[in-house]
Amino acid sequence: FSSLFKGREDVFAKRWYSKASGKSGYQPVCLHEWNRQFCNKKKYKCAQCPNRHFKNLEYEDIYKHLEGKDTDGCDVIGIYVVLDGNQCNFLCVDFDDKQCAHDYKNDVLVFVDVCKSWDIPCSIERSRSGNGAHVWIFFKEPLAAIKARKLGNAILTEAMNRDGRVSLKSYDRVFPSQDYLPEGGLGNLVALPLQGKARKNGNSVFVDETFTPFEEQWAYLLNVEKVSEPFIDEVLALHGLSSELGELSTTSESKPWEAPVAQKITNEDFPKEVVCVKSDMLYVSLVGLSGKVLNHIKRIASFKNPEFYAKQGMRLSTYNIPRIISCADILEEYVALPRGCEDVVVELLM
């Protein structure tokens, strides 16, 4: 278990839960917590506290996580993904119904389908809540976080080409979520699977492609394959993107009219006739459009978030700041775009 889900060992987080407010979250485990001589929660957050003294992750902590005796789930562990040297031991992509346009299971299966076609072994874990899933890819040796993220983004972009409904928000749910740790920061964390309490409800377990849990979870984990860095380099050389997140509309002030370049779209990707309705927005019918076309159309109204990249460049926290701002909205039968996209859409359809 520890050889697969390997994050930082000098610090880890535990879940907390407030019965009064019903809120929950994770915070690093500190040996000085509630010690009045050192701990001042009103003044400092745990990660920024000058008196912090984090507890090392030990087998006893993992055992309690797996046992799951705490009725409020406060024995659940979160591990910090990015190691010293900005490396990581795995890639984890989070899918849930909040971010997915149509059922997280569809997005998971499209992502897994890309992994299979690229010969990348991956594992599906149903989330603690049961309303989402994590897809894990494990590395044979620590890999640069920036390279792990490139792999995750390449798989996601191909998944979007195969099914245009896969949300652009998925780029924000790739862990590690940073290429480099912010100065003095701990980076993002991922909750460990096989949480004892959730497991009793059939959640936080590994499942097959029908989302049926494997009967022997430990036997499954013993046979999980890891990928090597040379193989990942081959995958990125073959499938890597000139643009990390695929083609998006530019945010350049000098050429704000430029649209993303259509990628390998042919007449076979379109029906004979495409219905467009101009109302409060521009509505383009989804009937007969291929996944590649839908993916391209939504990218016409999407661009990189300058706030995110400004903070990332200064090594500041980018928590809760999306990488991409998208003004496209995928409905049941149409994709809706701002009316200013009309000329570009018409040019694509001509």
Q: Which residue ranges define each predicted feature?
A:
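Signature for HUH/AEP ssDNA processing cores
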Residues: S2-N131, F138-K150, A154, N161
